[in-house]
Amino acid sequence: MQVQSLERTFVDKIFAICDYYLSRNTIRNSRHIYDISRILKKIDIFDLNLKLLIENVRNERKQNKTCLSAQDDANVQELLKKIVSTNFFKQDYNETTSKLLAKNVNYDDAIKSLQIIINSGLFAQS
């Protein structure tokens, strides 16, 4: 059985939350914020190979027109900023995701992971 790397899962989840933001779909999707916050503790976001992986994943996802954040005109860095500043996933996180967690991680703590990613510039020009 082949297992996807944490880095690939991380990148896919970033694109996924951006797609959900662009399609205005929060329902049961805030779980990705929690997942990202946990994965971020296990990977090195300054690994140069991660930038290449992001580019490869974007090119792969771009083929699917429903993957809005992978299209050429999408700016993932800016989308992440909007997700944080608008608290787009907060209600769903508090009403759905937080009830599913074995270890409680509140929204404000989970969303800090996106701010770390924004500050790193990892998705700048992506």
Describe each PLM feature range.
Residues M1-S126:
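Structured mid-to-C-terminal alpha-helical surface segments
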